[in-house]
């Protein structure tokens, strides 16, 4: 147990229960500025830094830490504007630096007293605008330079922004009132990654069938990420189409057909402007979709219930690490989202009995893209929970 003061003349301390010597050393090495940052968003409670937390520590939080989520789009937009190899800066930040921060970040269950919805809704709206801006500057750079290696790297950077500020944001906003401004921003974001059918399939298919054999987004144990991606993308599209068909919207009246044709028309417009512009757009959309399906894959991997069986907090993987939570709009508190889909992100909570991922979302990405490693790590986790 390590006791760190806040380096100010206040009678307040934060106790850091470290799961490893490395965690403790890192936190100490970061010095007073880091400790002040932690304290700024903390109340004097236990903050658990153990990657495999045995208990659930709580901490009262506000919306302010979620401003960290804007680092990625700002870095990406700035890098593409500067051009050259700077176009890759968003990718390096998100999948290079963030996994390191994520690995050492404390695991904390958030608590919030009375919540003002305005700032939280503004976060969602801002994420949507940042994604649109990142798309715009990528297409500008592609039109200026052509489909060069730096532009491809810029497309990968924007793809990560699309996976977070675009799709994760749309995931949250897609559960809001249909026709509201935030809901409309979500529709635009999904259109810009060529995945407009996501809200239909997610809300009407996935939430009903998750962790069962009927859900194409829930992977059984033993299936690798790349196999899952190949199988789930067409299956989810088909499921979304079927959802509307069962409501009488068949053939040319099916909304999925309409959005598909609109997306194809948009690609045609981009190609008319420049083939380089269209190719850059496709690069970002492809990576954004891959990241979405990686998240789906990870969130329910190996967790199974029978069709019709009541769902519980044991049917989704959870992670309480502050870096993943703060930069991914509380998405890692996934069991709470499935227990009540209408719960906004600021009301999501951790569950003591929920199975815990081996690390945060950024770290798990590198595990998942190497299927043998992922399967070995998750086999141990599933055995630990007797699943």
Predicted regions and their residues:
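Membrane-helix interface/capping segments
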Residues: 104-116, 304
């Amino acid at each position: 147990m390590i006791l760190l003061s806040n380096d100010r003349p206040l009678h307040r301390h934060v106790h850091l229960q470290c799961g490893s010597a490395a965690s403790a050393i890192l936190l100490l090495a970061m010095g007073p500025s880091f400790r002040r940052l932690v304290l700024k968003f903390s109340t004097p409670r236990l903050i658990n830094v153990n990657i495999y937390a045995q208990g659930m520590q709580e901490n009262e939080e506000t919306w302010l830490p979620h401003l960290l989520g804007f680092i990625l789009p700002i870095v990406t937009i700035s890098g593409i504007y500067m051009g050259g190899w700077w176009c890759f800066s968003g990718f390096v930040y998100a999948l290079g630096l963030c996994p390191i921060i994520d690995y050492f970040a404390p695991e904390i269950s958030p608590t919030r007293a009375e919540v003002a919805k305005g700032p939280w809704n503004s976060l969602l709206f801002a994420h949507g605008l940042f994604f649109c801006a990142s798309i715009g500057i990528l297409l500008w750079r592609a039109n200026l330079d052509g489909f060069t290696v730096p532009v491809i790297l810029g497309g990968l950077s924007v793809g990560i922004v699309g996976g977070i500020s675009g799709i994760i944001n749309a995931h949250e906003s897609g559960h809001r009132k249909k026709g509201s401004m935030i809901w409309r921003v979500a529709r635009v974001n999904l259109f810009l990654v060529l995945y407009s059918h996501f809200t239909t399939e997610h809300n009407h298919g996935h939430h009903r069938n998750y962790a069962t054999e009927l859900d194409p987004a829930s992977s059984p144990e033993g299936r690798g990420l790349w196999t899952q991606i190949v199988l789930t993308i067409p299956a989810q599209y088909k499921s979304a189409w079927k959802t509307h068909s069962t409501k009488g919207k068949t053939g040319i009246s099916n909304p999925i057909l309409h959005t598909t044709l609109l997306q194809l028309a948009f690609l045609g417009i981009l190609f008319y402007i420049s083939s380089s512009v269209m190719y850059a757009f496709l690069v970002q959309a492809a990576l954004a979709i891959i990241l979405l399906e990686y998240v789906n894959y990870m969130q329910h991997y190996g967790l199974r219930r029978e069709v019709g069986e009541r769902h519980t907090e044991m049917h989704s993987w959870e992670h309480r690490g502050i870096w993943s939570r703060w930069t991914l709009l509380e998405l890692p508190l996934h069991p709470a989202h499935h227990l009540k889909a209408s719960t906004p992100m600021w009301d999501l909570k951790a569950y003591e009995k929920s199975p815990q991922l081996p690390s945060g979302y950024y770290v798990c990405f590198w595990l998942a893209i190497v299927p043998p490693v992922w399967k070995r790590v998750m086999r141990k986790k599933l055995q630990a929970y007797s699943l």
